[in-house]
Amino acid sequence: GTLINEEWAEFFAKNKPRRINITLYGSKNETYENLCHMKDGFDKTIRGIELLKKYEIDVKINGSLVKKNFHDRMEIIDIGEKYDIPVRIDTYMYPSVRERTTPFNFHERLNPEDAAKARVEILHREMGDELFEQYAKQTIYLAEHTEEGDACPGHMTCRAGQSSFVVNWQGMIRSCIVLDQPSYDAFDTTDDFMTLWNKIVKETEEIKTSMECSQCKLRHVCNTCAAAAVAECGDYEGVSKYLCEYTKETVRNL
């Protein structure tokens, strides 16, 4: 968002994307300076959003909640409402590699209890009373009535490598933005796109996730996945203690 100027806005108006996602890291310049080390980052991002709106380009605001912007969470939603832009704030953050083996209170991200509480609070605000009540009832029902699963490895259940893919800044096509495999050069003309896509589908199908998670009674309301397992544990079949606590606390707060 900080890089969007009049020239770029005009470019996107002529070459219209389906949507541009802009991450707001805070609701004021002070937060941007503290978190992103950019004194005027908030002003620049808002200017970028206003330019995209001016040129009638569809925009969505994303938020990534950590300790340093925790108190800005509701103000970020206010900004979305002001500009009539949908907002989605993520309260679960992947850990950095150096944080995998450190206690939660030493992480830059929120501890799982605070992250779960914020998740419920934010979802309530984003959904409104009626829709949130339906969501809460459904989630609690699933948490309380799901039987223990079979003792077998799980598999990728999201759209990655099934109906979606990403191309990163290096031009590598992958099933998931977080996972580094499978990965192929999108600009390698040796194979056509469908050949690359079929390779990605096949290799994604071969990824196995935790047997323990497959058996868990909270599996239908938990955010764990192959990407989270790798980020948290360094292994597709790892079990994240952070996500276990995050899920239990989410259900409790509903």
Predicted regions and their residues:
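Helix N-terminus capping/helix-initiation residues
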Residues: 5, 109-113, 192, 240
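A generic local structural motif
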Residues: 6-10, 200-201
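Short beta-strand->alpha-helix junction loop in the catalytic core
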Residues: 1-3
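Radical SAM enzyme [4Fe-4S]-AdoMet core and its adjacent flexible, acidic
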Residues: 10-160, 169-170, 174, 178-184
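Structural motif corresponding to alpha-helix initiation and N-cap regions
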Residues: 5-6, 29, 70, 206, ...
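Accessory C-terminal segments flanking Radical SAM cores
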Residues: 85, 102-103, 133-252
